Design a protein with these regions (language model features):
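Active-site-proximal region of nucleotide-activated glycan assembly enzymes
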Residues: 42, 50, 121-186
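A short, well-ordered alpha-helix in the C-terminal region of glycosyltransferases
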Residues: 345-359
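C-terminal alpha-helical cap of glycosyltransferases
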Residues: 2, 358-384
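A short, glycine/small-residue-rich beta-strand->loop->alpha-helix junction that serves as a flexible
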Residues: 17-30, 209
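Glycosyltransferases and closely related glycan-assembly transferases
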Residues: 62, 92-105, 113-128, 141-146
Length: 384
């Protein structure tokens, strides 16, 4: 984010964002911070030690570390120590609220957001949560209930995990993405049968492991007519890069294999088909850029959130779901071959993905924040 003036120079008042320290939480927080600062708000981010590594993406001096801990209910002997850290974070937030006098507190999930949201309720400050996934995370469920968040901003429709009463507070905004993603969007053009076909494959650490093992085997099953024009870019674990590249070369395919792509939005825009997991940011970015994708949700994930994310896009016609446990190289190769030569289906799916995307999500979320900031004193809306 471009650096700006200090908080004393801002005239709109202060908004506090609270986020866990992972990209899935921090990307939308960063996008909202950009939108709010453009509207003359002073934005402060409260996060944990991991989130402090993102300081260079926010305005100088606007990121503050608070005490926090994940609650591991499966190991109850650790809970007292973990709870004490959350209580310490709660007290830290109350002290900082007295100094900052925020108009609104916005939680983006992750346990570091919990003490911030609880402190907002105690201090009588308006609050809202933004849920990135189609299934509410634990921290946001706590924030919406015990934290008494007045607004629940959702990225997907339908949204699962909240009570019927809490659902009355839901507002569909979409999941804010980085400006780099918005700038990468351009019309999709399916390639002719004799033109190069760009396949992009990526996932998180577990996705990278599975795709590194599976995708070269799938490609080896493809007809020569498909292999001849196929170009692959794939995210791999560092220890897998050489082996994956060699497997593709043995199949006659040119492959760019890296552990990290710093130009991922541009790679997505250049792709004709994407094979990926279905994390919230991934689905949001593919929608904004408008590219057809085969989604392979992370199996056995908590609450099946990735499956629900992918189902939202599939219902909109913007992609296809394949379940990892059911996939075989032969069956997947048959699906891929059909799509490779079906320009109409690829184009139709790309358009549907784009229609499902929300490039204005950050602005819609900023609108919700400002509506709260302009309202009166918070009312108790927690479940009875």
């Amino acid at each position: 984010m471009e650096k700006s003036e200090t908080s004393r120079d801002k005239s709109g008042g202060t908004i506090v964002l609270a986020s866990g320290g992972t990209g899935g939480h921090l990307f939308p927080a960063q996008a909202l911070a950009t939108a709010l600062e453009a509207r003359n708000w002073n934005v402060q981010l409260f996060t944990d030690k991991r989130g402090m590594e993102w300081q260079d993406r926010f305005r100088d001096g606007s990121v503050q570390e608070i005490s926090s801990s994940t609650l591991t209910f499966g190991r109850p002997w650790l809970l007292p120590k973990q709870a004490s850290k959350l209580i310490a974070g709660y007290k830290e937030c109350l002290a900082r609220f007295k100094e900052l006098a925020p108009k609104v507190v916005v939680g983006f999930g992750g346990y570091p957001s919990v003490p911030v949201m609880m402190a907002a309720r105690y201090a009588g400050i308006f609050s809202m949560v933004h849920e990135q996934n189609a299934v509410a995370g634990r921290a946001n469920r706590i924030a919406a209930g015990l934290g008494n968040a007045q607004v629940i901003a959702s990225s997907f429709e339908p949204l699962y995990g909240f009570s019927a009463k809490q659902m009355e507070r839901v507002r569909l905004t979409g999941n804010p993405v980085r400006k780099l993603v918005i700038d990468a969007a351009r019309p999709y053009k399916a390639p002719r049968a004799d033109a190069s076909f760009n396949l992009l494959v990526f996932g998180g650490s577990q996705g990278a492991r599975f795709f590194s093992e599976f995708m070269p085997k799938m490609v080896a099953e493809l007809p020569k007519a498909v292999i001849r024009t196929l170009r692959v870019a794939q995210q791999c674990r560092p220890e897998d890069i050489d082996e994956v590249r060699a497997a593709y070369e043995a199949a006659g395919v040119t492959a760019l294999c890296r552990s990290f792509f710093d130009d991922m939005p541009e790679l997505i825009a250049r792709s004709h088909l994407v094979v990926c997991r279905a994390g919230a940011s991934t689905v949001a970015e593919l929608g904004v850029i408008g590219r057809p994708a085969i989604y392979v949700p992370l199996p056995h994930s908590l609450d099946n959130d990735q499956l629900r994310n992918a189902q939202s896009m599939e219902r909109a016609g913007g992609g296809w779901i394949m379940l990892q446990d059911d996939m075989t190289p032969q069956q997947t190769a048959a699906v891929f071959t059909r799509l490779r030569f079906d320009e109409a289906d690829l184009t139709r799916t790309a358009l549907a993905a784009s229609a499902h995307g929300r490039p204005d999500a950050a602005e819609l979320l900023a609108n919700q924040v400002e509506e709260l900031a302009q309202a009166g004193q918070p009312k108790e809306t927690a479940d009875e």
